[in-house]
Amino acid sequence: MRDPVSSQYSSFLFWRMPIPELDLSELEGLGLSDTATYKIKDSSVGKMIGQATAADQEKNPEGDGLLEYSTFNFWRAPIASIHSFELDLL
């Protein structure tokens, strides 16, 4: 008899909603039309797999503005400023 706990129908991956395909026209409406910095793995799946090469990044030296607001940079504690006279006290 089948174990109901390990059944494929009880898994999260079976019951979750599929990720919708990315519509590039919606990105243009938001002002994020610079999609050349990403390579599309498979157009039928619509997954982004990585950033552009170094030659493409030289063309755009300011980089992607959204990378500044990643979850790591946004939620980390600010670096404490230590002055030279405080270092002398240590």
Curated annotation (Swiss-Prot):
Listed GO CC annotations: centrosome; cytosol; nucleoplasm
Chief subcellular location: nucleus
The keyword Zinc-finger belongs to this UniProt entry's keyword annotation: no
Entry keyword Acetylation: no
InterPro entries per UniProt: MLLT11_fam (IPR026778), WRNPLPNID (IPR033461)
Disulfide bridge partners, by residue number: none
Subcellular localization: Nucleus; Cytoplasm; Cytoplasm, Cytoskeleton, Microtubule organizing center, Centrosome
Residue list for modification Phosphoserine: 84
PTM note: Ubiquitinated, leading to degradation.
Assigned keywords, A-Z: Cytoplasm, Cytoskeleton, Nucleus, Phosphoprotein, Ubl conjugation
GO BP annotations, alphabetical order: extrinsic apoptotic signaling pathway; intrinsic apoptotic signaling pathway; positive regulation of apoptotic process; positive regulation of DNA-templated transcription; positive regulation of mitochondrial depolarization; positive regulation of release of cytochrome c from mitochondria
Motif, Nuclear export signal: chain positions: 24-32
Family statement: Belongs to the MLLT11 family.
Subunit details: Interacts with HSPA8 and LAMP2 isoform A; the interaction may target MLLT11 for degradation via chaperone-mediated autophagy. Interacts with TCF7.
Job description of the protein: Cofactor for the transcription factor TCF7. Involved in regulation of lymphoid development by driving multipotent hematopoietic progenitor cells towards a T-cell fate.
UniProt-recorded name of the protein: Protein AF1q
